[in-house]
C-alpha cells in the first residue's frame, strides 16, 4: 500500500498546478493566508476527489439519488483513502435536533430508560412497579413474626357517589367487613354514604398474623384482593403503616397507568409521547407585545405599532380603529405610548372584549357613523398567522413573534408520564439538561441494583464513552438538550469530531476545517490530544489551521501562498515546523520564528470618558452581573468556552442596542437595565456570514461602489448619445444584460447521471451584457472589464474618481486588493466576507458614536491577516468609535485597550466577572485563565 498521498497538477480555483506528496497516517496541517488556496487544496481537491471516487463506484441508479460530484481540476491523485470532511457548514437548523440526537447519545439514553427506568405516579410521585402475586407475598412474608396484618381490596379511590351497587355486590360475595373512609363497618348493617362527597372503600379480605404457616392462605387472599380491585391490593400492617401493591404498571392509589416501556416512548418525535401543547419542540412561538410596539416613546401617529398591517402608515383601517379606541378610552394618538392609559393600551393590543366602539367611516360617497367591536392587534395577528398559507405573510408576522418555553412541559418536550420515569433519581430531560461534565460524573457514580447493572452495563458504557469524547474536545459545558441550531460552527465541528472518534474507524482520511475555532487556549491541549488519538488509530488527518500550537504539534505542514487570491495558490513549503521556519518565502515561517509579530501597543487608549453599563445580566448562565463598557476603546470580551461571552454581548447588549438605535425587532436576553445608550447613535454587527447567497452578489454590489461605477458609465458620451441610464449597466435587470443567460454569463446543462455542466453563454461569451452595452467604454474598458479587474487594478484605474477610489481604497486597506471587483459572493471565505463588511463601514463617514460588535473575527484568518485586522479595528476606534470583540485569539486580546474576562469556568461554573481592565491587569490576575496565557505574550 502507498505510504503517501501523491497529488499532481492541482489547479482548482486559484491553485497554480501544484504537485505535492504528503505522508499517510500523520497529523498534517495546511496553512497560509486567508484566500491563499488551502481549502481549495484540502476540501475542493483532495476531499472532493475521494468522495467522487466513492460515488462513482456505485450503480447509476444509486448515483441519481446521491447527486454527482464534479471532478476537481487535478491531473492525478494517488494513495487516497475513503474521505470524511468535518467542516463548520453543516449544522442542522431543525429545532428537533439537539446535541444528544446529533451525537446519538440520546438514542442510547432512550434505550437505557426503557430497560432500567423506574416509573412514578405523576400525582403522588409513588414508584410504580409491576409485581406478581408471588413477589407481593414474598414482600409481606419478610415482615417480623407475629406482626398483625389486614389484606384489603381498594375498590373505590377518591370518587363521589353512594356506591350502593358496589356494597351490595361485595356483601353477596360473602365478605363480612368493609373499611369506608378509614372506619370499619360490618356489611350486615346498612351503610349510607353522602352522594356528593369523595369516598375510599376497601374490602377487608383477610386478617392474619405473620408466621411460616400462612403463605398458602396469604397467596389466596392476595389473589382475591387483586381480583376485586383490578390488580391492586393494600397490606395494612396494624398499628404501623399501609403498603400498596399492584399487578399492573399503575399507581395503586391514583390509577396512573404506564404502558410497558420501550425506547420509542422517550422520543420527542413520537406524537404519542411528545408534549401535546408544543408537539415535542419544548417551545412555541407567540406574538410579543414588546416587538409589536418596540419603542414606547413614539406615539401611535408616529408609527409606534410595527406589526404587519397595523401601522397607521399602512392604511386607513388601522387608523380608524385606533381613533375609535382613543375616543372610547380618552387619550390622544399623538401622545407617547407609555402615556396611554393601561386599559386603552390593552384594548389596542388585545381587543375590546365585545365592547362596541363608535367608528366614523369616510368614503368617496361621504361619511357615516357605525358601531363595532375590535379583536385587538395581537389576536388579529395570531388569527392571520394560523390561517394563512403564504410563507411571505407568515414571515412578516414572525418578525413580531418570540420563542417561549412551553408552559406545559417547561421545555422538556415529553408528556408528564414519560418524565416520571427515572434512572438514578433523574428523568431523561433532567439528565440531558446537565452540562456534559456533570453528566459524565453522574454516569460514573450511578448506583444500580445487580439486575439493572446486568441489563444496562453495555448501554451505560456506550454513553460514558461518547460523553468522554465530547469532554475531551472541550465541550464539557454544553448539555445534550442544547439545540443544534444554537451551536457555533466550531462547536458543531468538534461534536462531529467526537462522533468520529467514537466510531473507531481505521484507514480513513479526515479533513478538518479549523477545529480550534471558539476554543479557549486552555482547552486547546485537549483538542490536540484528541486529534493525535484519531491519528494513532491509523488515520490520516489533514487540518486546515492557523493556530500556532496545532502547527507545532503537527507531523507535517503544508504552507500555501505566498499571498491570497491570484497572488496565492503556490506551494511555498512542505515539511516539519523547522522546514517552514527556514523557508524565506514563508510568511507563516516568519511569524513562527518571531521575525514578524503583532506588536503590543506602546500605550492603551483612554477612551472618551463615557461608558455603557449593563445592570443585572442574567441570560443563560450569567449570574446577575453588572458590566461596564468604556466607550471610545477597543474592548475584548474573553473567557473559556461557555463562560457567558455570547450571552452578554450578542443576546443582551447587541439585541437591546439594535432595538433602541436601529429600530430592530429583537428580544434581548434577561437583564435589569442598560445606561449610557444616549452616547451612541448606531450599532453594527460585523460577522462572517456571506455578503450574499447568490452568484449575482459581489464586493462591488455590497460596498455600493458598483452604483457609482454604473453612474460613471451612464455619464460617458456614448451612453448619453444612446440614452442609456445607470440601470442599463446592471446585470440584474432587463435592458443591458444578456437575456440568453439573464446576466449570469454561464448556462447550466443538466447531465442527469453525470454532474451538471456549466458552460459560458454562447451569446455573450460569458460577459453577462449584450453587445450594445459592452460597446460603451470608459478609458477603453467596458463595464465587464471593470468587474474582471482586481481591487488593486481598479483603484489604479479609477484613481481620478474620488467616490469610486475611496471605496476601493478601503478594500485595499483591509487586505482585499487581490479579489476581483465582481467576484461572486459565494466564492468568498468567511474572513473575506467579514473584511468586505469592515471596508464598507470604513468607507462611510463616521460620527464617532458607533459601536461595532464582532464575534470571533479571527476565524479563518492567518496571523498576517489578524495583523491587518488589528490595524483596521484601530482605524475604527481612532475615529472615536467603540469596538467590542468576543475573542480567544491572544494576538487580538493583547492589542485591546480593555478586557472583560468572564468565567472562571464554562456552563454553571461561569457567568461571573473574573477581572476587567487592561491586558496587563488581566495578566496579573491569578484566577484568570486568559491572564495566564496572555502574560508570556506581553513580555515579548
Q: Predicted segment positions?
A:
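Conserved phosphate-binding elements of NTP-dependent enzyme cores
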Residues: 1-940
Amino acid at each position: 500500500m502507498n505510504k503517501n498521498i501523491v497529488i499532481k497538477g492541482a489547479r482548482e480555483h486559484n491553485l497554480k498546478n501544484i504537485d505535492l506528496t504528503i505522508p499517510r497516517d500523520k497529523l498534517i496541517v495546511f496553512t497560509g493566508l486567508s484566500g491563499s488556496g488551502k481549502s481549495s487544496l484540502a476540501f475542493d481537491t483532495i476531499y472532493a476527489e475521494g468522495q467522487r471516487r466513492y460515488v462513482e463506484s456505485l450503480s447509476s441508479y444509486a448515483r441519481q439519488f446521491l447527486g454527482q460530484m464534479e471532478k476537481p481540476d487535478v491531473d492525478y491523485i494517488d494513495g487516497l483513502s475513503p474521505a470524511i470532511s468535518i467542516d463548520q457548514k453543516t449544522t442542522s437548523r431543525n429545532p428537533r435536533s439537539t446535541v444528544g440526537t446529533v451525537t446519538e447519545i440520546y438514542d442510547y439514553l432512550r434505550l437505557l430508560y426503557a430497560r432500567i427506568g423506574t416509573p412514578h405516579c405523576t400525582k403522588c410521585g409513588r414508584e410504580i412497579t409491576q409485581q406478581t402475586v408471588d413477589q407481593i407475598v414474598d414482600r409481606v412474608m419478610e415482615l417480623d413474626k407475629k406482626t398483625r396484618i389486614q389484606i384489603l381490596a381498594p375498590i373505590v379511590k377518591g370518587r363521589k357517589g353512594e356506591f350502593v351497587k358496589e356494597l351490595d355486590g361485595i356483601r353477596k360475595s360473602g365478605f363480612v367487613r368493609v373499611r369506608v373512609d378509614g372506619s370499619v363497618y360490618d356489611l350486615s348493617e346498612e351503610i349510607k354514604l353522602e352522594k356528593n362527597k369523595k369516598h375510599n372503600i376497601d374490602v377487608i379480605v383477610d386478617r392474619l398474623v405473620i408466621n411460616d404457616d400462612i403463605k398458602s392462605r396469604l397467596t389466596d387472599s392476595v389473589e382475591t384482593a387483586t381480583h376485586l380491585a383490578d390488580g391492586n391490593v393494600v397490606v395494612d400492617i396494624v398499628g404501623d403503616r399501609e403498603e400498596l401493591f399492584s399487578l399492573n404498571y399503575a399507581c395503586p392509589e391514583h390509577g396512573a397507568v404506564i404502558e410497558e416501556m420501550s425506547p420509542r416512548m422517550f422520543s420527542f418525535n413520537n406524537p404519542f409521547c411528545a408534549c401535546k401543547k408544543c408537539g415535542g419542540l419544548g417551545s412555541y412561538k407567540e406574538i410579543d407585545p414588546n416587538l409589536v410596539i418596540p419603542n414606547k416613546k413614539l406615539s401611535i401617529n408616529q408609527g409606534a405599532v410595527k406589526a404587519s398591517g397595523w401601522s397607521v402608515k399602512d392604511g386607513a383601517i388601522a387608523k380608524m380603529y385606533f381613533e375609535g379606541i382613543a375616543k372610547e378610552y380618552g387619550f390622544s394618538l399623538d401622545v407617547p405610548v407609555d402615556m396611554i392609559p393601561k386599559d386603552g393600551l390593552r384594548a389596542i393590543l388585545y381587543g375590546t372584549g365585545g365592547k362596541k366602539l363608535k367608528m366614523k367611516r369616510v368614503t368617496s360617497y361621504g361619511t357615516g357613523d357605525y358601531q363595532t367591536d375590535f379583536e385587538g392587534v395581537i389576536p388579529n395577528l395570531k388569527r392571520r398567522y394560523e390561517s394563512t398559507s403564504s410563507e411571505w405573510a407568515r414571515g412578516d408576522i414572525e418578525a413580531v413573534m418570540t420563542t417561549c418555553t412551553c408552559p406545559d412541559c417547561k421545555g422538556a418536550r415529553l408528556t408528564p408520564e414519560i418524565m416520571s420515569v427515572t434512572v438514578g433519581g433523574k428523568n431523561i430531560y433532567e439528565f440531558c439538561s446537565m452540562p456534559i461534565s456533570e453528566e459524565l460524573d453522574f454516569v460514573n457514580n450511578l448506583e444500580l441494583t445487580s439486575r439493572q447493572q446486568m441489563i444496562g452495563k453495555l448501554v451505560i458504557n456506550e454513553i460514558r464513552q461518547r460523553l468522554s469524547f465530547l469532554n475531551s474536545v472541550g465541550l464539557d459545558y454544553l448539555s445534550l438538550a442544547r439545540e443544534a441550531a444554537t451551536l457555533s460552527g466550531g462547536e458543531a465541528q468538534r461534536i462531529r469530531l467526537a462522533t468520529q472518534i467514537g466510531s473507531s474507524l481505521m484507514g480513513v482520511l479526515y479533513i478538518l476545517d479549523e477545529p480550534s475555532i471558539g476554543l479557549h487556549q486552555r482547552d486547546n491541549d485537549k483538542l490536540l490530544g484528541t486529534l493525535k488519538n484519531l491519528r494513532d488509530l491509523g488515520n490520516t488527518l489533514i487540518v486546515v489551521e492557523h493556530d500556532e500550537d496545532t502547527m507545532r504539534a503537527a507531523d507535517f505542514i503544508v504552507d500555501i501562498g505566498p499571498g491570497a487570491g491570484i497572488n496565492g495558490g503556490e506551494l511555498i513549503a512542505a515539511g516539519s515546523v523547522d522546514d517552514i521556519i527556514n523557508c524565506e518565502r514563508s510568511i507563516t515561517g516568519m511569524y513562527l520564528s518571531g521575525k514578524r509579530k503583532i506588536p503590543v501597543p506602546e500605550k492603551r487608549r483612554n477612551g472618551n470618558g463615557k461608558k455603557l453599563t449593563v445592570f443585572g445580566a442574567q441570560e443563560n448562565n450569567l449570574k446577575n452581573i453588572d458590566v461596564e463598557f468604556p466607550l471610545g476603546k477597543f474592548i475584548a470580551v474573553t473567557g473559556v468556552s461557555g463562560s457567558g461571552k455570547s450571552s452578554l454581548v450578542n443576546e443582551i447588549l447587541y439585541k437591546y442596542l439594535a432595538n433602541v438605535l436601529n429600530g430592530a425587532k429583537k428580544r434581548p436576553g434577561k437583564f435589569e437595565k442598560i445606561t449610557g445608550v444616549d452616547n451612541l447613535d448606531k450599532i453594527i454587527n460585523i460577522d462572517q456570514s456571506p455578503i450574499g447567497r447568490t452568484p449575482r452578489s459581489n464586493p462591488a454590489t455590497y460596498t455600493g461602489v458598483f452604483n457609482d461605477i454604473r453612474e460613471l458609465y451612464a455619464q460617458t458620451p456614448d451612453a448619453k448619445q444612446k440614452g442609456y441610464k445607470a440601470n442599463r449597466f446592471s446585470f440584474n435587470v432587463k435592458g443591458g444584460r444578456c437575456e440568453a443567460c439573464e446576466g449570469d454569463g454561464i448556462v447550466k446543462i443538466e447531465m442527469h447521471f453525470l454532474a451538471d455542466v456549466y458552460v459560458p453563454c454562447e451569446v455573450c461569451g460569458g460577459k453577462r451584457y449584450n453587445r450594445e452595452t459592452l460597446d460603451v467604454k470608459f478609458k477603453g474598458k467596458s463595464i465587464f472589464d471593470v468587474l474582471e479587474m482586481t481591487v488593486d487594478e481598479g483603484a489604479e484605474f479609477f484613481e481620478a474618481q474620488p467616490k469610486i477610489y475611496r471605496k476601493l481604497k478601503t478594500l485595499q486597506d483591509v487586505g482585499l486588493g487581490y479579489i476581483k471587483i465582481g467576484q461572486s459572493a459565494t466564492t468568498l471565505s468567511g474572513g473575506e466576507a467579514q473584511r468586505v463588511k469592515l471596508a464598507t463601514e470604513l468607507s462611510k463617514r463616521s460620527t464617532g458614536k458607533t459601536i461595532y460588535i464582532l464575534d470571533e473575527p479571527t476565524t479563518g484568518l492567518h496571523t498576517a491577516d489578524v495583523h491587518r485586522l488589528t490595524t483596521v479595528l484601530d482605524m475604527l476606534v481612532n475615529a472615536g468609535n467603540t469596538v467590542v470583540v468576543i475573542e480567544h485569539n491572544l494576538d487580538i486580546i493583547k492589542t485591546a485597550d480593555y478586557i472583560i474576562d468572564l468565567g472562571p469556568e464554562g456552563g454553571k461554573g461561569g457567568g461571573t466577572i473574573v477581572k476587567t481592565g487592561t491586558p496587563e491587569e488581566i495578566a496579573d490576575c491569578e484566577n484568570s485563565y486568559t491572564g495566564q496565557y496572555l502574560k508570556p505574550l506581553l513580555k515579548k
